[in-house]
Design a protein with these regions (language model features):
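Conserved oxyanion/phosphate-binding beta-strand-loop segments in alpha/beta enzyme cores
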Residues: 1-36, 66-75, 99-106, 282-323, ...
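Residue patterns forming the tRNA-binding/recognition surfaces of aminoacyl-tRNA synthetases
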Residues: 2, 11, 15-19, 91-241, ...
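NTP-handling and nucleic-acid-processing catalytic cores
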Residues: 3, 8-13, 49, 135-363, ...
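N-terminal catalytic cores of NTP/NDP-binding nucleotidyl/phosphoryl-transfer enzymes
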Residues: 25-96, 123-138, 245-246, 313-350, ...
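Glycine- and acidic
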Residues: 38-47, 119-124, 329-337, 379-383, ...
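Secondary-structure transition/capping motifs at alpha-helix termini
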Residues: 63-71, 91-97, 109, 113-117, ...
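Alpha-helical recognition segments enriched in aromatics with Gly/Pro capping
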Residues: 309-315, 319-332, 361, 475-614
Length: 800
């Protein structure tokens, strides 16, 4: 058969679409499989090869599961709100809706050209009001349950995008969108109380099948620690200064305290502080730094002593100096820390820089050279002296703190509450109203969606306010509670809002009465397998798990965890081994590969290029190799034979069925394809194949290369569509070779290899070994004293 992919691929894509082969059926009697991929952000650049690899895993699994008789839900949609579109809209003076619609159309055509078996009837667009109505609905539920609050705080702010960023969106001190350095600014921020769900997010990991690396990233990000809250006081003032520590056993070693420069007690008692000018100057310098810069361990130690305030250590009554330093943040813990320089390296460095006392309370190191952070016997600690077990000394100190009313056991999380508002246009309007009489009031549910108003100017104000704040007809409204004059919230939600529940909407995408029907949720949820990028583990994955746990708690979904299994693909690097980027000139456009070699070649290559979970460089010669493989597959039509004589590759055929079946489930796609290549070579050695065996081969290859396999299947008279035909089964007995080759040793040295019947007894094996001419030459004139046979592995004859 001539492999004309430019005719074959559009032909079968149209046939599949016309027959609606990939549309999932609600409430089918078949077992269900819900396979999910991270829906794309529809950028103007269109699809890249990373999308192809990311979607190919679940694509192959979904096609295989359909052939195994499952009712498969494999949906797609678009995460369409976001800053890049809005920035482009500002640059080109084009409405974001127009840009988004064009980009989605482009993306959809590209995805279809690769032949992905998505259920297009369930496509969602997070920027459409019939979708974000329910995003707003979930937000209001969070608000009604006390999980939304507003606070004025230092925030991560991108001066280029003019937007507040969450910690997750500003990792490394850079804006996740434009990579500009983030600065700290005081702003009113809407937060979601994700920290209320920290424990559930941690314990929920015990109930899901995620790779250990993903679980550990989430555990580290949540950062749960156990310790104690301790009440220091300020000398001469009836003022409690609470700190949190994981090491209350070291309280006798505290020699100074450090506050965040923004700590409110500084302003409260500024009249007692003699160096406020210096403190304010230091604060100004801190404001120019990102949170990332402030908290780096490897940097010069900066700080300033507060002249006029001293803290009192509650366990020994000693007065200690109070400093401000940039590395202490108001958003972590209580905004103040106790410092034990003998046993914490950062405190030790700070103490040396500022000439502060260092008191040893744990024996074991030389604190004149560095902090000792190991275990040892407690000293200089009164009632803890002699303790040599950290757990016991912590427990004893915590007990005493509670007895004296100067502290208590506690838990802290590194994860912060989720900064949820953005001062931009292209996002979901936050459905809240500010009333001077009633305070903050939610928009009535029956008035949802609160639609984005039409605007001509999308640029955020120089005051950092949203473009919506300039639209009086949107801002001015009536309070839903008292009927008096009020003003709408003008910030919008972050891009992560719509993606926090999209997997639920796929279950019932056209429902206008609820975000999804509960019976459909019970049928489809949880997601059986979710594949996505490692870069989303501490953002989207945590956010969506949080929303889902909340919806479960209020009875709106049927499972606490949304995803039963999660996997991640490795990155496709440029041919130079570097990350693909336009500046390096190493970007590969997947449609160039489709146009030059065909979609099936691209599909096979991205899964054959290496371990699925690892990064791998693009290799043009390997792409050509995959095309040659498919050319040889097409050539099988030329050696179809009616000869009923057994073929030499029958055992290999059954082995291949088993291997491909198992390897797909294990995401070992490269070895599955390699097994098909090996089988193909053996078929060509025999130079004949029956229609029955060819059909088996085509079925195994179909999830990887569905177009060419459908074409050949039709050509040989196959009934219906190969893509929904039954997956082949192997005969376990036929996966065992009739003969095996084993090495023959004489006195422990390998002298030959012989072929023996698989599963034969010792006598048969020994007879075959002794009949070998080379072995016989080493036995001649010798006395056999021992014969050893390890079935299927080795024969050893001991002589003297």
């Amino acid at each position: 058969m001539k492999y004309d992919f430019k005719k074959i691929e559009p032909k079968w894509q149209k046939k599949w679409e016309d027959e609606r082969l990939f549309e999932a059926k609600d409430f089918s009697d078949k077992p269900k499989f819900y396979g999910l991929v991270e829906f794309p952000y529809p950028s103007g650049a269109g699809m890249h090869v990373g999308h192809i690899k990311a979607y190919s895993s679940m694509e192959v699994l979904s096609r295989k599961r359909r052939m195994q008789g499952y009712n498969v839900l494999f949906p797609i949609g678009y995460d369409a709100f976001g800053l890049p579109t809005e920035n482009y809209a500002i640059k080109t003076n084009t409405h974001p809706r127009v840009i988004t619609d064009a980009n989605i159309a482009k993306f959809s055509n590209q995805l279809k050209s690769v032949g992905f078996s998505f259920d297009w009837s369930r496509t969602v667009d997070t920027s459409k009001d019939d979708y974000y109505k329910w995003t707003q609905w979930i937000f209001l539920k969070l608000f009604d349950h006390g999980l939304v609050f507003r606070d004025k705080t230092l925030v991560n702010y991108c001066p280029h995008c003019k937007v507040v960023l969450s910690n997750e969106d500003s990792q490394g001190g850079k804006c996740d969108i434009c990579h500009t350095d983030v600065i700290q600014l005081p702003k009113d921020v809407w937060y979601l109380k994700i920290t209320d769900y920290a424990d559930k997010l941690l314990t929920g990991l015990d109930d899901v099948d995620y790779p250990e690396a993903i679980k550990q990233q989430e555990v580290n990000w949540i950062g749960k620690s156990t310790g104690a809250f301790v009440n220091f006081t300020i000398d001469g003032i009836d003022e409690k200064l609470e700190i949190y520590t994981t090491r209350p056993d070291t309280l006798f070693g505290v020699t100074f305290m450090v506050m965040a420069p923004e700590h409110p007690l500084i302003d409260k008692y500024q009249d007692r502080i003699s160096n406020m000018d210096a403190i304010n100057a230091y604060r100004d310098e801190c404001a120019k730094k990102t949170e990332f810069e402030r908290t780096q361990l490897v940097k010069d130690k900066t700080g300033l002593k507060i002249e006029g305030l001293e803290a009192v250590n509650p366990v020994n009554g000693k007065k200690i100096p109070i400093f401000i330093a940039d590395y202490v943040m108001m958003g972590y813990g209580t905004g103040a820390i106790m410092a034990v320089p003998a046993h914490d390296q950062r405190d030790w460095d700070f103490a040396h820089a500022f000439g502060i006392d260092i008191i040893e309370v744990i024996q074991g190191g030389d604190i004149s050279k560095e902090a000792y952070t190991g275990d040892g016997m407690m000293v200089n600690s009164e009632y803890l002296n002699g303790f040599d077990n950290k757990k016991d000394s912590i427990a004893k100190m915590t007990e005493i703190l509670e007895e004296k009313g100067i502290g208590h056991a506690g838990i802290q999380f590194k994860m912060k509450d989720w900064a949820f508002n953005r001062q931009r246009y292209w996002g979901e309007p936050i459905p809240l109203v500010h009333c001077p009489k009633c305070g903050v009031v939610g928009v009535p549910y029956e008035e949802l969606p609160l639609r984005l108003p039409e605007v001509k100017d999308f640029e955020p104000g120089e005051d950092g306010k949203s473009p919506l704040a300039r639209i009086e007809s949107f801002v001015n409204c009536t309070c839903p509670k008292c009927g008096g004059p009020a003003q709408r919230e003008t910030d919008t939600m972050p891009q992560w809002a719509g993606s926090s529940w999209y997997f639920l909407r796929y279950c019932d995408p056209h429902n206008d009465k609820a975000f999804a029907d509960m019976d459909k949720l019970k049928y489809w949820m949880p997601v059986d397998w979710y594949n996505g990028g490692m870069e989303h583990v501490t953002r989207h994955l945590i956010y969506s798990r949080f929303w889902h746990h909340f919806l479960y708690d209020i009875g709106e979904v049927n499972t606490p965890e949304p995803y039963m299994k999660r996997s991640a693909q490795g990155m496709i690097l440029g041919s130079d081994g570097e990350k693909m980027s336009k500046s390096r000139g190493n970007v590969v456009d997947p449609l160039d590969i489709v146009n030059q070699y065909g979609a099936d070649t691209l599909r096979v290559y991205v899964l054959f290029m290496g371990d699925y979970g690892s990064a791998a460089p693009w290799n043009d010669s390997s792409v050509k190799g995959c095309r040659r493989f498919l050319d040889r597959v097409a050539g099988l039509t030329d050696i179809i034979s009616d000869d009923k004589k057994a073929v030499s590759y029958e055992t290999l055929l059954h082995k291949t069925i088993k291997k491909v079946t198992d390897d797909i489930e294990a995401q070992k796609f490269n070895t599955a394809i390699a097994a098909l290549m090996t089988l193909l070579n053996e078929i060509y050695k025999e130079n004949r194949i029956s229609k029955e065996n060819l059909t088996i081969f085509l079925k195994l290859l179909s999830p990887f290369a569905p177009h060419i396999t459908e074409e050949i299947y039709e050509m040989i008279g196959g009934e219906g569509f190969l893509t929904v035909s039954a997956w082949p089964e192997y005969d376990e007995a036929k996966t065992i070779d009739a003969t095996v080759e084993v090495g023959v040793q004489v006195n422990g040295k390998v002298r030959a290899a012989v072929s023996i019947p698989a599963g034969c007894d010792k006598d048969t094996a020994m007879a075959a070994a002794k009949a070998n001419d080379r072995v016989a030459s080493f036995l001649e004139g010798k006395k056999i004293v021992k014969e050893i046979f390890v079935p299927g592995k080795i024969i050893n004859i001991v002589v003297k």
